[in-house]
């Protein structure tokens, strides 16, 4: 069997384009489509070419499910056909984000719709079957725990559930969809590989909303569910059962366990770590490379699966981004030298994104631009968004040319 491209002992460099899609709208809630807001639909070819120019070997890039399947079972492949062909022609590998927060408009109640797991699996199967040999690397669903917090615990995104009960309902539905997605893709493309991506979570202080044990276990709940670990005696079994999840629903995961090929760790030094205030609000805590090391080691020790840094960057000045690029890569190389198989490094986002708070505001998108990328997006007098290479772009190119100095 041919060795997968990530397993050749090199450190592979990639970038990712922010691809949050929440198309539902309501009073005080605008739809958010990051591709539309960043004019990626118009500039996708330039954006992909820029990624290759930066030195990226792979890109984390998502599919807007709500546009590709505008009606149940009816697919519009025209744009994806063009994009996939261009990626192949320029030699840019894609780790396909099949789900990045939002569902199609026709799926009422979104993630808690009883048909969601099979709907998302059917969509994933159709994508995998059509693009087999071009796109063979998949993330079934990006950041499931964040997804469950926003959609099930905080009531921020549809279906707007709240509390532990809502979190439990959403995370179980998401995890079941992830299992069915991996099963369906594997059925039509045996060469497919899977990168499970979740947000890193770290906490400081004592004013926690749940016990520290529950919080620390809950950050792993999606991966523990899909790999069949949440059985009686597991801390999350009691948590989920206590919030209305039936025993037969939990047992389903043990009977249908899947294992991803890689674990993707998302880490941002400025806000992955938080401190809770007594009133329940949170403040971000700067954690630097110590936080990155901590999360990578936690996932490696728990699952024993190869690691990919699937998102990291720092907002603010170009100087701060330059510093983080160097610091984070040095930490990754130290971990590799110690025997931790960190196989990939992804600067995410590749270019400017629009803060999610845009969805709950009336101000123009430009007021919510967050510059964290190798490329800054700047609006011109003609309203077009220009892509402007920063010094971080050149520094990333240089690091790619140098390559990793240490092999895993």
Language-model features, listed with the residues they occupy:
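Short active-site-adjacent helix-start/loop capping segments
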Residues: 23, 59-61, 67-71, 103-106
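N-terminal carbohydrate-binding accessory modules
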Residues: 1-55
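Short, well-structured secondary-structure segments
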Residues: 57-67, 93-97, 308
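Short, basic, glycine/proline-bearing loop/turn elements
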Residues: 30-33, 69, 280-281
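Active-site region of glycoside hydrolase catalytic domains
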Residues: 2-14, 84-320, 330-408
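Catalytic domains of carbohydrate-active enzymes, especially glycoside hydrolases
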Residues: 37-64, 256-264, 298
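Aromatic- and glycine-enriched glycan-recognition loops and surfaces
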Residues: 35-54, 71-86, 90, 115-122, ...
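Conserved strand-to-helix beginnings and helix N-cap segments that scaffold or border functional pockets
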Residues: 73, 77, 319-325
């Amino acid at each position: 069997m041919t060795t997968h491209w990530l397993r050749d002992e090199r450190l592979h460099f990639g970038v990712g384009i922010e691809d949050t899609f929440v198309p539902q709208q309501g009073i005080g809630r605008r739809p958010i489509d990051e591709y539309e807001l960043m004019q990626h639909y118009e500039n996708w070819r330039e954006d992909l070419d820029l990624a290759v120019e930066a030195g990226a070997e792979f890109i984390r890039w998502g599919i807007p499910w709500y546009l590709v399947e505008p009606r149940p079972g009816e697919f519009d492949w025209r744009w994806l056909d063009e994009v996939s062909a261009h990626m192949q022609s320029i030699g840019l590998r894609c780790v396909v984000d099949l789900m990045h927060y939002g569902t199609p408009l026709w799926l009422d109640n979104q993630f808690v719709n009883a048909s969601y797991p099979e709907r998302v699996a059917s969509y994933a199967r159709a994508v995998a079957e059509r693009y087999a040999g071009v796109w063979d690397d998949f993330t079934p669903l990006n950041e499931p725990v964040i997804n469950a917090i926003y959609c099930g615990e905080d009531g921020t995104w549809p279906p707007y559930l709240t509390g532990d009960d809502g979190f439990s309902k959403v995370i179980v539905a998401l995890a079941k969809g992830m299992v069915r997605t991996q099963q369906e893709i594997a059925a039509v493309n045996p060469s497919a590989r899977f990168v499970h991506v979740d947000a890193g979570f770290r906490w400081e202080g004592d004013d926690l909303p749940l016990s520290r044990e529950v919080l620390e276990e809950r950050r792993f709940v999606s991966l523990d569910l899909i790999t069949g670990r949440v059985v009686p005696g597991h801390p999350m079994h009691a948590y989920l059962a206590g919030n209305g999840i039936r025993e037969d629903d939990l047992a389903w995961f043990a009977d249908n366990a899947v294992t991803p090929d890689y674990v993707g760790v998302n880490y941002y030094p400025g806000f992955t770590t938080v401190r809770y205030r007594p009133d329940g609000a949170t403040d971000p805590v700067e954690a630097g490379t110590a936080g990155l090391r901590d999360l990578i080691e936690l996932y490696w020790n728990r699952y024993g699966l190869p690691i990919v840094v699937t998102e990291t960057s720092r907002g603010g000045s170009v100087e701060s981004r330059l510093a983080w690029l160097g610091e984070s890569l040095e930490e990754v190389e130290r971990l590799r030298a110690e025997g931790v198989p960190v196989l990939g490094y992804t600067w995410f986002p590749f270019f400017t994104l629009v803060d999610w708070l845009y969805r709950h505001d009336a101000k123009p998108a430009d007021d919510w631009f967050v510059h964290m990328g190798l490329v800054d997006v700047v609006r011109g007098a003609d309203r077009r968004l220009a892509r402007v290479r920063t010094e971080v772009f050149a520094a990333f190119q240089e690091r790619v040319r140098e390559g990793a100095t240490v092999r895993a």
